[in-house]
From Swiss-Prot:
Name of this chain's protein: tRNA1(Val) (adenine(37)-N6)-methyltransferase
EC number(s) recorded for this UniProt protein: 2.1.1.223
Taxonomic source organism: Pseudoalteromonas translucida (strain TAC 125)
Location(s), subcellular: Cytoplasm
Keyword Transmembrane assigned: no
Reaction(s) the record says it catalyses: adenosine(37) in tRNA1(Val) + S-adenosyl-L-methionine = N(6)-methyladenosine(37) in tRNA1(Val) + S-adenosyl-L-homocysteine + H(+)
Gene3D superfamilies: Vaccinia Virus protein VP39
Length: 232
């Protein structure tokens, strides 16, 4: 199996354009799930985020949406082989997805390349570029599928953060928590973990280095992810 083995589940990813990545692991471990009963994973890919969140909060009712047929099939297989086969997966675009009940938490590791050159792999282009799911459409989907107390957590490259925050603000959303991520202490900030809601409150800021100066996983990263990695 081509994939990644975690402590409680395995994720095959050979059929997916976007493989298991540190971005996904960061978001799945970091997202605030407190007081939540329902969660929507937008663009689930391998099913990684849905599985991580279910491990963290087994009481969650989780729904995952994936537009790509091969990734959808892979997510189904990964979820069926996990301890939580009742995670629901839909093959359709989030733009056309509807739910009778709003979700408490929405989570996404979205496409983020706005103006970059594309390769020949159509599925990978869809997974990585905003043509198939723009930031505006992502925010619109959250607003359609949420309630007044819902939260929206995502991870983005630092270069896209200002644009996303501006769009979110224009749509009545507020940044509540923001964790800036570096690969190592001497590297520039490369990623931002963010949670938005309809509530205007003081932003909780934090920082995280994935590895230390000796190229070992940092204490903070281990504390965040040790429930998942086999060798932590």
């Amino acid at each position: 199996m081509s994939g990644f083995a975690f402590k409680q589940f395995k994720v095959a990813h050979e059929q997916c354009a976007m493989k298991v990545s540190t971005d996904g692991i960061l978001l799945g471990a970091w997202a605030n799930l407190s007081n939540a009963n329902s969660l929507l994973d937008i663009g689930t890919g391998t099913g990684l985020l849905a599985l991580m969140c279910k491990q963290r909060s087994p009481q969650l009712t989780i729904t995952a949406v994936e537009v790509d047929k091969n990734a959808y099939q892979q997510a189904l297989q990964n979820i069926a082989a996990s301890p939580w086969p009742n995670i629901e997966v839909h093959q359709q675009s989030i733009q056309t997805f509807n739910s009778a009940q709003p979700f408490d938490v929405v989570i996404a590791n979205p496409p983020y390349f706005n103006h970059s050159l594309k390769g020949n792999n159509k599925a990978r282009n869809i997974a990585r570029h905003t043509d198939g799911l723009s930031f505006a459409e992502l925010i619109s989907a959250f607003k359609k599928l949420s309630h007044a107390g819902s939260t929206f957590s995502l991870i983005l490259p630092t270069t896209e953060v200002a644009v996303f925050i501006e769009l979110a603000t224009q749509n009545g959303l507020f940044l509540n928590t923001h964790c800036q991520v570096k690969a190592t202490p001497n590297k520039a900030i490369s990623r931002s973990l963010m949670t938005f809601s309809y509530i205007n409150q003081s932003i909780v800021e934090s920082a995280l280095c994935i590895k230390d100066n000796e190229n070992n996983y940092s204490e903070d990263y281990i504390a965040l992810c040790k429930a998942f990695y086999l060798k932590m």
